[in-house]
């Protein structure tokens, strides 16, 4: 009951953003730097998709202009209100032709999906990426060891994503396709950690 109330509150874009600032201070700067570094190693992409975009794309901070896709109509409406195209849809059945995008991104989505759906979503992202393009996935992972990062462990346990994984478990979701390169790093003052992974098609 309490969880449902919290989830409904997080449907409001300003509460969604505020919760991120409170629970993950410093995350925006660190993650932006990491992704910026990664972009220097990747080919230029013109047609970009952000899967699980939320009410606004993280990629906007990097002056990228993706099409957004999210299961929440509230989020895609807000995304569209900012002047960018967005589609309401499911990550495990992306409504695009094979090879349609130069790059496909997913930031903070997979821990909201059970293993079978997450695997299918990754498969779909690769399917709609053109040969020579790339897929980038960033997702949270459980702290290891938990006792060294108690604040991060607690935040992860309270996360509305019900499928928070260890690094090994997240990498196993990706392992159906060979060639993923992943980097684990801490990205907030509360000790939150994530895995930034790229796949060149």
Functional labels for PLM-detected ranges:
Residues 49, 54-93:
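Class I SAM-dependent methyltransferase SAM/SAH-binding core
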Residues 2-33:
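Class I SAM-dependent methyltransferase Rossmann-like catalytic core
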Residues 119-131:
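A short glycine-rich, Lys/Arg-flanked "PGG" loop and its adjoining helix->strand segment in the class I
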Residues 162-178:
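Short alpha-helix
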Residues 132-140:
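Conserved beta-strand signature within the Rossmann-like core of class I S-adenosyl-L-methionine
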Residues 144-160:
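Short, glycine-/aromatic-enriched active-site segment of Class I SAM-dependent methyltransferases
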Residues 179-190:
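Conserved S-adenosyl-L-methionine
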Residues 105:
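A conserved beta-strand element that flanks and buttresses the S-adenosyl-L-methionine
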């Amino acid at each position: 009951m309490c969880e449902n109330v919290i989830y409904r509150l997080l449907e409001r874009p300003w509460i969604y953003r505020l919760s991120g600032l409170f629970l993950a201070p410093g995350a925006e700067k660190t993650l932006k730097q990491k992704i910026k570094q990664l972009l220097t190693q990747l080919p230029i992409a013109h047609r970009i998709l952000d899967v699980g975009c939320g009410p606004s794309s993280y990629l906007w901070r990097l002056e990228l202009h993706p099409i957004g896709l999210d299961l929440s109509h509230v989020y895609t409406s807000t995304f569209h209100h900012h002047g960018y195209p967005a589609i309401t849809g499911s990550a495990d059945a992306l409504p695009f032709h094979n090879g349609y995008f130069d790059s496909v991104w997913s930031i903070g989505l997979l821990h909201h999906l059970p293993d079978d759906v997450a695997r299918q979503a990754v498969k779909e992202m690769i399917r709609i990426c053109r040969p020579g393009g790339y897929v980038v996935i960033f997702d949270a992972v459980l702290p290891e060891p938990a006792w060294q990062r108690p604040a991060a462990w607690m935040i992860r346990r309270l996360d509305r994503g019900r499928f928070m994984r260890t690094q090994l478990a997240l990498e196993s979701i990706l392992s159906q396709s060979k060639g993923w390169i992943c980097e684990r790093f801490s990205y907030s003052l509360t000790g939150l950690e994530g895995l930034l992974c790229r796949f060149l098609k």
